[in-house]
Every structure is written in C-alpha cells, then in structure tokens.
Amino acid sequence: MLLTGLAKKAWGENEDAVIGLGMLPGRKGKKASGFFTRFPTGGTGETPYFYYENVSSHLVEKSKEGKREYKIENLCDMREDTPWVEGVAGWGIGESFVIKTWKSSDDKYILLMNGYISASNPKLYDENGRIKKIMVEGVTSGKKKEFIVKDTPHPQTVDISFLPEQEDVKITILDVYKGTKYEDTAIHFMILWRTEVIPYE
C-alpha cells in the first residue's frame, strides 16, 4: 500500500521546493514504520494545531477489550488507524463539523486523506465508506460550494479560496462511496492547508 502526494511551494521554503507526503508500504507480518516521510504543519492528536467543533456525531465501538472512540480530533492525527468515523445509522449523509482557523492563517485549501487508512489491514479502506461529495461553507460569510472528493487514500486538496481568509469552515457530507462491509463513513485526515497537493496517480 503506497500513499504519497506532493505539496507545492510550501510556506517558509524556496518557492520551487516540493514537499513529499507519503506512507511506506507495510511488509507482510510487520506494521509500516515511518508512516509519513514528513508531517505538514497541523500537529498530531496529542498537540493539535487545528481544532474542531460542532461535530454532529462520532462512532463508539464497544468490545471485550473495552471502548474505542473515533473522535473528530483524529482528523489532525496522521498515524494509521486513527480516522474520524461518523456515528449515526446509515452512511452519515448530512453529518457535519467545523474546522476552526487562526486569525493569522492564509489557508486556501483543505488537505485531506479519505477513508479508513491502515497499513496493517488495508482492506479497511474498501470495507468502510468514504466521502464522495461534501459541502464547504464559511461559518461567518455563509458562502458555500459543493466538491467531489476522489476515492483514494492518497493526500488530496480542495480549493477553498472562494472563502474569506481566517474564516471557520463547515464541512457537510452530501454523498459517499459505500463500503463493502461496514455502514460507516470514515475520514482519515482533514486540516486547513496553504498549498495544493498533487495527488499520486
């Protein structure tokens, strides 16, 4: 399972520089290490630089081992097996959340990785639902636009330059790619980002 993408013209670096985002392929019987070759600014689950609010739901799984929650904070955690998963009956159509922004931010894109990503159990990507169409809306301005999201675990971006800068962004699920086993829709990673990502083909 190869996961990669290229971010162009990163802030604070040479304008011609290219940043790589990638997951190393998992070897049989071993978990992939070095999940990302480089972390984009956005933090991890422990020290997030992005915050989320007004999330409509999240999945809580109960088993003999205990309880596991697929919380919205997982969206800024790049480690494998840490998606946000909606928690309502059905495919999560209409579920939503808000990504908070910073007063000094100049983000023009949403950087995301679709689905449930697991190097040790890659079939979870197909078995769970993935977002297909989303509504992106400025919380203050009310400006909104629909986008089709690619059905790929590779990093991709959504251009939100139509929104005023420093505006909180509301995401609503409008349609999904249905999973083959679980009636749950997952997003592995989603933050606001300054640069476009060139998807791996």
Task: Put a short name on every predicted segment.
Residues 25-34, 107, 143, 179-180:
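Short, surface-exposed beta-strand/loop "edge" segments at domain boundaries and coil↔beta transitions
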Residues 10, 30-33, 76, 134-137, ...:
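Residue-level detector of intrinsically disordered/flexible regions characterized by low predicted structural confidence
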Residues 21-22, 58, 134, 139-142:
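Compositionally biased, intrinsically disordered low-complexity segments
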Residues 141-162:
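Extracellular carbohydrate recognition and processing domains
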Residues 3-100, 196-201:
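Disordered, acidic Ser/Thr/Pro-rich linker "stalks" and the adjacent N-terminal cap
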